[in-house]
C-alpha cells in the first residue's frame, strides 16, 4: 500500500514539475517572454479559472454540499490561524528586522490554493485505482469552493497583517534606495560582499522584476491606484468609481465561485447545462474545455517566471528566516492539520466521511505559500524582494515535501 501510494505521489508531483519545466523551456526559447507571460497569467485569472470554477462547482453544488462547504471554510480559517501562530513563533526564533516580521509571520498562513491543488487532486485521482474517473470533477469542485474563503483570508488577513508593519517604520523599499541591502539579522555594512553600486542596482532591479512577475501568477489583485499593472487597464473586476464600496478580497475568480455556488442551488438549472442531452450543454462543454486547460497554462507561466530573471540571492531574506519559512509552511502546518483531521474522523461522528473532501482539505494545507502574498507586499511597499527570494527556495523544497505528504495522505489518510 505504501509503495503504491509513493508511486501515485511521485507521478502526480512529477507531472506538475514537468509542466513547470516546459514553461521554463519556453521562456528560455523566447516564446514565453515578459509580455507573453503577463498575457498568459491574465488569461488564466480572467477567463480560464472562472470557467474552471463554474464547470466544477455547478455539478457539485447542492443543499447536501453546504455542510462540506462549511468544513472547507473552517479548514481555511484553521490553516490561517495556525499558520499565523507558527509564523509568529518563527519570528521570535529567527529575529528578523522589524520591517519584515509581519511579512514572515503571514507566509505559513496563506497557501497556494488554485493551480497546484486543481492539478494535483486530478492527477492523484487519475493514478489511484481507489477513485473513479468521475471523482475528478467533484474534487476540483471542492477546490473551487475552498477558494471562496481563501480569497477572503488572502486579502483580508494578508493585507491587514502585513500593512500594520508600515505603522512601525518606513517601507523597506524606501530604505534600500539609499543604503546597501541588508541581510536579515546583520548590519548593512557586512550584509553583502564588496561590489560596485551599479552591480547592486542591477541585482536589486532583477529581483524587483522577479517580484512583480511572481505576484501576477495567482488570483487577481485588488485594484488600487498604486498597485501593479493598473495604469493601462480599461476594464477591471473592481470598477474604479465603485472601488471604495468593494472589499479588497472581491475578484473575478472569487465572485465566480460565490455566484456559481448560489446558482447551483436553483432547482432544475443543472439539468439545462450539465447533461449531454441538455439544451445548453454546448455552452457548458466549451467552458469546461477552457477551464480544463487552466491549471496547465498557469503552471507554464509559473515555470517561465521562475527562470526569467535568474535565481534570487538567499542572502536577500537571510538563511534562518528562509529555513523557518520553509519548515513552517511545508512541514509543521501540514503535520498538525492532517493529524487533526484524522483525529476528528475517528472520534467525531459529525465529521464528513467523504474521501474526496478529506483529500482536498489535506492537499490545501501542504501547498507552498501563495504567490499573491508578494502582491500584498508590493501594494503595501514592504518586503516584496525578501519574500520573493524565500518563495523561490520554498517552492524547490515543496517538490519533495508535496511528494512526501501526498504519499502519507494517499496511504494512511484517505
Per-range role (PLM):
Residues 1-414:
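Alpha-helical transmembrane segments of multi-pass small-molecule/ion transporters
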